[in-house]
């Protein structure tokens, strides 16, 4: 059986880790790394075997994402976005559009992204303000999306729009280069994950063939949980990102403690309080990774409470990551505050954890509703 984590970890150590500081410093999308990710075949893992892919599932999706995030959170997040958009397309898309997208991924090394957040509604991505004018063979769209990961680099963008009055919930797949589609890269100046290029996306009189409409038929697609499969993959991916990031914070803080010398040949690691902090970091990383593995295993087995486990794992990884980042800075001290070493970069990356959709507060609310038998939506 293929070890997806090891495969991705070896790639990450060779092709991502050496460039993590540069990605953060320049704040640019790591195109060369993503070209290598595509060439190595990582974007193909969710493609069904009948299309020539590996037919992998949520566990493998999380394992690869975590390994990439251990190199830099930017790589993990941008990778997971592509997988989520692909999973949605494979689940709900018509054969024509599935074949087109799969061919581009398999033969042309393309990848995808999500475009759902908006300026007015923020993380409430199901409440789109997009304007869609439907015609017989095409539709005209006007509107904007606020923070689009991999903007200007992904080849397809999955956008949310208001439900169709006749056919119900729908997303659209927007090919890069569509007339009327623009990105504002100058508006991206992220505190952390600076290589995401999560800039605004504008659509002005954008004309799309109606084949790019992906209608959400939950019954036909056999959706077993209260939200669609793409949301579940997204939460698993974010859990993996912050699990990987938390693991790297632990390793970086431990390395600093072992290498920081005092007179008398002692190190920070010889101080009892610092040992307690390092132990705390290990605990955070271990708990997050254990929760991720348990939740994705439950989802792979379609266990009844798998959705609650995925959400709880996401909350755990997010809060543990932020806690570890703060503790890592305490261990790093003045050197970390002066941006010597990776700990200050890792802290900035971690601060995205509690606020990304679905936010920690939203997730806790959802878990509470489900375990008390209330309607989620």
Predicted regions and their residues:
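Glycine-rich beta->alpha junctions and the first turn(s) of the following alpha-helix
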Residues: 190-285
């Amino acid at each position: 059986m293929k070890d997806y984590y090891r495969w991705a970890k070896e790639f990450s150590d060779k092709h991502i880790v050496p460039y993590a500081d540069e990605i953060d410093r320049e704040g640019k999308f790591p195109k060369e790394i993503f070209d290598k990710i595509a060439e190595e075949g990582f974007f193909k893992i969710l493609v069904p075997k009948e299309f020539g892919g590996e037919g992998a599932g949520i566990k493998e999706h999380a394992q690869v994402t975590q390994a990439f995030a251990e190199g830099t959170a930017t790589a993990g997040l941008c990778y997971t976005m592509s997988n989520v958009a692909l999973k949605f397309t494979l689940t709900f898309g018509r054969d024509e559009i599935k074949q087109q997208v799969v061919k581009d991924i398999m033969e042309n090394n393309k990848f995808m992204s999500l475009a759902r957040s908006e300026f007015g509604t923020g993380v409430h991505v199901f409440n789109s303000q997009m304007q869609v004018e439907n015609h017989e063979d095409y539709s005209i769209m006007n509107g904007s999306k606020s923070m689009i990961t991999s903007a200007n680099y992904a080849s397809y963008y999955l956008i949310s729009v208001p439900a169709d009055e006749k056919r119900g919930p729908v997303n659209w797949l927007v090919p890069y280069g569509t007339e009327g589609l623009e990105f504002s890269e100058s508006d991206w100046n992220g505190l952390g994950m600076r290589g995401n290029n999560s800039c605004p996306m504008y659509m002005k009189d954008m004309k799309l063939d109606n084949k790019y409409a992906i209608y959400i038929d939950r019954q036909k697609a056999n959706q077993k949980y209260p939200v669609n499969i793409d949301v579940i993959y997204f939460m698993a991916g974010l859990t993996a990102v912050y699990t990987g990031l938390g693991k790297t914070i632990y390793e970086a803080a431990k390395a600093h403690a072992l290498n920081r010398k005092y007179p008398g040949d002692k190190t920070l690691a010889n101080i009892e309080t610092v040992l307690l902090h390092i132990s705390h970091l290990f605990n955070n990383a271990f708990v997050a990774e254990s929760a991720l593995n348990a939740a994705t295993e439950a989802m792979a087995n379609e266990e009844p409470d798998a959705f609650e486990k995925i959400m709880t794992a996401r909350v755990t990884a997010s809060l543990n990551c932020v806690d570890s980042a703060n503790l890592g800075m305490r261990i790093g001290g003045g050197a970390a505050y002066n941006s010597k070493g990776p700990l200050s970069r890792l802290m900035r990356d971690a601060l995205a954890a509690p606020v990304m959709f679905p936010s920690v507060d939203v997730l806790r609310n959802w878990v509470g509703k489900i375990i008390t038998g209330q309607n989620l939506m």
